[in-house]
Regions:
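Conserved alpha/beta-hydrolase "acid-adjacent" motif
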Residues: 301-307
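Short, surface-exposed "cap/lid" segments of acyl-processing enzymes
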Residues: 28, 35-92
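Short beta-strand/loop motif that positions the catalytic acidic residue
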Residues: 288, 294-296, 300
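Alpha/beta-hydrolase active-site loop
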Residues: 99-119
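Glycine-rich "HGGG/HGxG" loop immediately N-terminal to the catalytic nucleophile
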Residues: 84-100, 333-336
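Catalytic active-site module of serine/aspartate enzymes centered on a nucleophile-bearing elbow/loop
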Residues: 318-356
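Alpha/beta-hydrolase-fold enzymes
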Residues: 118, 122, 132-272
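N-terminal cap/lid segment of alpha/beta-hydrolase-fold proteins
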Residues: 8-43
């Protein structure tokens, strides 16, 4: 893929048929600038109330609107939800900052929830959270910072951080070395390198990922997963989405990878200890009354589905029969959201859990 093609992909705004999108700037509780996207369908009623969509690391809110005929946003609007998508501090649409999961949990998510409730007048909301948007949102909920969130549907990872062997080896051994050369690790180096280290890494990664000719797809696999590719199955995504991916990933700071390294070593989320609002023991009984639904692709090679099984078991032991768990055969990490047949295989489960 040429640089020009990758840059063109960056500005695609798919999945917006009949939708209006209002972009609302706001600040996290520590002053970091964020944005909220309010997606509406003119004249449509929203009897199910507000739902907040929270993206993962190194992407942005638009990850929920790939170039598909039916996106998750479409499914939620069709079902009568009032859809809000936050660009928290990990978003590639914002000025890059060093961040940890604790920062997002303490400062971003409470501010985002507050904004939605203030704008809608609703007393509560529900949330669909993915990857590091999920881990940080769960930290926030466990710490008692999201009392107005009643349902949290979490995809891929939440309380327990279980990686494939190769990914575990990378984060334990390679991330400290990467930090010596770069403050970030970025899949966008697949089409735009930023110095000798990124060029060397890109050359190595592309040479060891011959499964497709999209260098960003290869870099995503190296950065976040263990597989060829690591975050989706090629059979599950169409060509337009595979091309679109080139513009939807950028860097994540090594401050995040350092915290995740500690979490992987522990097998569950571990706070940095630098943010007083965060509960010191995230395995203690959570300070939230929210109902959780834990989702995972059975073939996830970013975070193994075993992590979501353990998280469900943890919450189910505290409140038997209240929470839910689903695994999707044949799906991985992000194809749960933007797979070509996700409208049929995964989105109905997400919508159904948010209805409850």
């Amino acid at each position: 893929m040429s640089t020009s093609t990758a840059h063109r992909a960056r500005y695609v705004r798919p999945g917006t048929r009949g939708q209006d999108t209002e972009i609302i700037p706001f600040e996290a509780d520590d002053g970091v600038p964020l944005t909220m996207l309010h997606v509406t369908r003119p004249g449509a009623l929203t009897p199910r109330g507000p739902v907040l969509l929270v993206h993962g690391a190194g992407v942005r809110a638009e990850i929920f609107r790939p170039p598909l005929e039916h996106t998750l946003v479409d499914a939620l609007l069709d079902d009568g939800f009032d859809v809000w998508m936050v660009n928290w501090r990990a978003s590639i649409d914002l000025r890059p900052v060093a961040w940890t999961l604790d920062d997002a949990a303490a400062y971003d998510h409470p501010a985002a929830v507050r904004l939605v409730l203030e704008r809608t007048g609703a007393p509560t909301l529900k949330a669909f959270v993915h990857c590091q948007g999920s881990t940080s949102f769960v930290i926030s909920a466990i710490s008692g910072l999201l009392p107005d969130v009643t349902t949290i549907v979490t995809n891929a990872v939440s309380l327990h951080t279980i990686l494939p062997g190769w990914s575990s080896l990378k984060i334990r051994t390679l991330s400290p070395m990467v930090r010596r050369f770069s403050p970030t690790l970025s899949p966008k180096w697949g089409y735009k390198t930023e110095g000798p280290f990124s060029r060397m890494l890109r050359t190595t990664v592309v040479a060891t990922h011959p499964e497709c000719d999209n260098p960003v797809c290869a870099m995503v696999s190296f950065t976040y997963g263990a597989g060829h590719p690591g975050l989706w199955a090629h059979r599950n995504i169409d060509k337009a989405t595979h091309d679109w991916i080139a513009g939807e990933f950028a860097g994540a700071p090594m401050t995040f990878f350092t915290q995740m390294r500690a979490c992987v070593q522990a097998g569950h989320l571990v706070p940095t200890g630098d943010v007083p609002l965060i509960a010191p023991d995230l395995m203690a009984p959570p300070r939230t009354d929210a109902r959780f639904a834990f989702l995972a692709g059975a073939d996830n090679r970013c975070f193994l589905p075993e992590g979501q099984r353990r998280s469900f078991a943890h919450f189910d032991a505290l409140s038997p029969g209240r929470h839910a768990h689903h695994e999707f055969p044949g799906y991985g990490h992000l194809d749960v959201i933007f797979g070509a047949n996700a409208w049929r295989d995964t989105h109905p489960v997400i919508v159904d859990e948010l209805r409850r």
